[in-house]
Amino acid sequence: MDLLKLNRSLQGPGPGSGSSLCRPGVSLLNSSSAGNLSCETPRIRGTGTRELELTIRITLYAVIFLMSVGGNVLIIVVLGLSRRLRTVTNAFLLSLAVSDLLLAVACMPFTLLPNLMGTFIFGTVICKAVSYLMGVSVSVSTLNLAAIALERYSAICRPLQARVWQTRSHAARVILATWLLSGLLMVPYPVYTVVQPVGPRILQCMHLWPSERVQQMWSVLLLILLFFIPGVVMAVAYGLISRELYLGLRFDGDNDSETQSRVRNQGGLPGGAAAPGPVHQNGGCRHVTSLTGEDSDGCYVQLPRSRLEMTTLTTPTTGPGPGPRPNQAKLLAKKRVVRMLLVIVLLFFVCWLPVYSANTWRAFDGPGARRALAGAPISFIHLLSYTSACANPLVYCFMHRRFRQACLDTCARCCPRPPRARPRPLPDEDPPTPSIASLSRLSYTTISTLGPG
């Protein structure tokens, strides 16, 4: 994907560079640098301003790179080791983590280092490989986001139909198709990527398209396939999910008020027991309105029979309890789901809309785009797109209670704490007398030896 082609500035001007840079059909892979050579008149900046801009840029690159690599590696390890998290949704999250990790590793170092050095020193093979892997990683990440949106829509709003095909084997086939489709779609990148001199001892890894018309068609194709279509799919799917959850929230609120009114009128159930809430259908979702957990999405909430009986016997209907009532807990869980869905769609558009807009602008108006975006603007636009690689782990996984617990379990397994040694009694002290709690853990034979006799 043309993430890194806009800024044509390099460190230090060289003779003859203007003709090569301004030739139609040439687009650079390097996006940003500390220098100011471009097809247009360079901007005059003070040395202090340039150094401050470079320091901020390097710091942001380093922070985003470390967060992306660390967060996605943690996701891969946790999802790979935890059997409880091997679900259909988490299979897509694992693929998303791999693509985000590939985006961080294949894009960011090869964007920052050539701009700091002023030339591309890695050769033609690395140039073509980086260009290809960059496009594949962005395509896979975007298609995975759309696949997750469709999977969650099916699971929440069409659960009966989804149970037929929503299996891990089907998810594996979809993920494989996503990677193969992305690999085929990005074949033009290594074909039209070259390392070309643009000045004395200055090389650039660039996309050299056959014509300006081809470049425009390619930019529009990527804009449609990797932004508009996935964006519409995500917006519609999460909009329908939010609507479904909102209807469930309103129904639960009305049902809760009706239940409280009935309890006040009837004086409560015998013995102060609470009856389980009604099961109702709402747009294809089967809602159990009184029993839920933190991770519930409001559909197919099923609890073990023993837990159901304990809840039925111990949940009071009158008087405030120490924690939220089951119905209130369900409402809170649904609100968290709605908030997370809104954050997902917002992050997608915020991170990717500037990049796709800038690439399309440059394809149709190169000089105007270079005048407006050369230097820091396009560099920070690309940093914003890289932010998605570290934002996805935070949104999709670290907001999930079970994943947080799995992270703690994995860390405890990898770094076990040494057993604490019990302090030995001093010579003039009596040994500690076993307590009732410790005696209860002993066998009958051990307890009998401590009795009178």
UniProtKB/Swiss-Prot annotation:
GO cellular component, one term: intracellular membrane-bounded organelle
Membrane topology: Multi-pass membrane protein
Positions of transmembrane segments: 58-79, 88-109, 132-150, 171-189, 220-242, 340-361, 380-400
Biological-process GO terms, alphabetical: digestive tract development; gastric acid secretion; gland development; pH reduction; phospholipase C-activating G protein-coupled receptor signaling pathway; positive regulation of cell population proliferation; positive regulation of cytosolic calcium ion concentration
Membrane-side (Cytoplasmic) residue stretches: 80-87, 151-170, 243-339, 401-453
InterPro entries xref list: Cholcskin_rcpt, Gastrin_rcpt, GPCR_Rhodpsn, GPCR_Rhodpsn_7TM
Lipidated sites in chain (S-palmitoyl cysteine): C414
Primary localization class, coarse: membrane
Gene3D superfamilies, sorted: Rhodopsin 7-helix transmembrane proteins (1.20.1070.10)
Presence of the UniProt keyword Ribonucleoprotein in the record: no
Entry GO MF terms: cholecystokinin receptor activity; gastrin receptor activity; peptide hormone binding; type B gastrin/cholecystokinin receptor binding
Intracellular or extracellular location(s): Cell membrane
Disulfide feature: C127-C205
Stretches the record annotates as Disordered: 257-276
Superkingdom of the source species: Eukaryota
Residue numbers on the Extracellular membrane side: 1-57, 110-131, 190-219, 362-379
Keywords noted in UniProt: Cell membrane, Disulfide bond, G-protein coupled receptor, Glycoprotein, Lipoprotein, Membrane, Palmitate, Receptor, Transducer, Transmembrane, Transmembrane helix
Role of this protein: Receptor for gastrin and cholecystokinin. The CCK-B receptors occur throughout the central nervous system where they modulate anxiety, analgesia, arousal, and neuroleptic activity. This receptor mediates its action by association with G proteins that activate a phosphatidylinositol-calcium second messenger system.
Classification via PANTHER family: G-PROTEIN COUPLED RECEPTOR, GASTRIN_CHOLECYSTOKININ TYPE B RECEPTOR
Similarity comment: Belongs to the G-protein coupled receptor 1 family.
This protein's name: Gastrin/cholecystokinin type B receptor
Organism: Mus musculus (Mouse)
Gene responsible for this protein: Cckbr
